[in-house]
């Protein structure tokens, strides 16, 4: 996928970290009246460490750790609380994970903080959430071509048909659309500084559609789908394209519906896409 950035001089709407935090906090507060006192939340605590004798941590040890591991010797302790409840056609889920680590780029980490509300077949969730690529087994892979689990979750707001629904007895559908905001501006400023160019306050967009063919109660299932992720907007610190790279509502729309500006023109953002195929054979007599 060819991709470059283009600058705009129009009035912009900046979604900074403070505003994002307010949106997520409000979303979490909206859940409080809906959560009863009849079900207790689940809590956990875990400890992890990675020690090596070479120059860097092996890739397979860093992968799928959602940013809690690092190339240096590292250790962390993480605790969290989660809540799930179903009320008639409503499903409510929320989770908060906090960690203290050494050997990485941060000491105090908000690893996960999200709320998920679903009504029948439609759903919305917002916050930092650990995600993996659809149909990818994290125990057998170090990540997908577009999205891996090697970095910390970024704040997102996602809406769509988050679980498969039946269109016909043999065809199911799942659709997702989300927007997010990268929060690594301070990290880039510390590590890149005044030497190299970088982009801060970058936006993120994801959309995907998946179909499942077959009866879930029988042996064979076939899944097919496509996903597209886009980094767009933000502000370049220096270089030939320094300044505003597009942060208005129009740029959010352009990320959702990419357009071709003609030969010689740049696309708005960095587009990456991947197709997914999965064939499943289910045998209830074999325990996996």
Q: Where are these predicted regions, by residue range?
A:
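Short loop/turn motifs that connect adjacent beta-strands in outer-membrane beta-barrel proteins
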Residues: 39-43, 83-93, 118-122, 164-174, ...
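Transmembrane beta-strand segments of Gram-negative outer membrane beta-barrel proteins
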Residues: 38-77, 85-96
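Internal, well-ordered domain-core segments that constitute the primary functional module
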Residues: 132-238
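Residues on the lipid-exposed face of transmembrane beta-strands in outer-membrane beta-barrel proteins
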Residues: 77-85, 113-119, 126, 157-163, ...
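Extracellular loop and loop/strand-boundary signature of outer-membrane beta-barrel proteins
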Residues: 64-67, 97-101, 142-147, 192-197, ...
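Residues that define the transmembrane beta-barrel architecture of outer-membrane proteins
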Residues: 69-77, 107-111, 150-160, 201-207, ...
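Transmembrane beta-strands of outer-membrane beta-barrel pores
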Residues: 49-57, 85, 98-104, 119-121, ...
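Long, internal scaffold/assembly segments composed of regular secondary structure
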Residues: 222-224, 232-288
């Amino acid at each position: 996928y060819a991709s470059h950035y283009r600058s705009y001089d129009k009035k912009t709407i900046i979604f900074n970290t403070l505003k994002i935090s307010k949106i997520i906090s409000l979303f979490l507060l909206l859940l409080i009246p809906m959560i009863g006192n009849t079900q207790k939340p689940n809590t956990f605590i875990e400890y992890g460490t990675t020690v090596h004798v070479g120059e860097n941590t092996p890739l397979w040890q860093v992968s799928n750790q959602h940013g809690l591991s690092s190339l240096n010797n590292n250790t962390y302790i993480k605790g969290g609380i989660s809540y799930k409840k179903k009320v008639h056609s409503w499903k409510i889920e929320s989770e908060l994970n906090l960690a203290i680590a050494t050997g990485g780029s941060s000491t105090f980490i908000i690893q996960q903080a999200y709320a998920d509300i679903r009504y029948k077949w439609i759903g919305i969730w917002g916050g930092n959430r650990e995600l993996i690529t659809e149909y990818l087994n994290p125990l057998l892979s170090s990540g997908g071509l577009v999205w891996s689990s090697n970095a910390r979750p970024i704040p997102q707001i996602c809406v769509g048909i988050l679980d498969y629904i039946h269109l016909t007895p043999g065809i199911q559908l799942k659709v997702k659309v989300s927007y997010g905001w990268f929060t690594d501006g301070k990290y880039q400023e510390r590590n890149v500084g005044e030497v190299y160019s970088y982009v801060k306050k970058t936006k993120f967009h994801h959309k995907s559609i998946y179909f499942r063919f077959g009866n879930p109660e029988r042996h064979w299932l076939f899944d097919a789908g496509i996903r597209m992720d886009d980094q767009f907007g933000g502000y370049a610190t220096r270089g030939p394209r320094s300044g505003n790279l597009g942060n208005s509502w129009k740029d959010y729309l352009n990320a959702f519906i990419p357009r071709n500006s003609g030969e010689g023109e740049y696309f708005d953002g960095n587009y990456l896409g991947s197709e997914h195929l999965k064939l499943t054979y289910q045998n209830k007599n074999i325990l996996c």
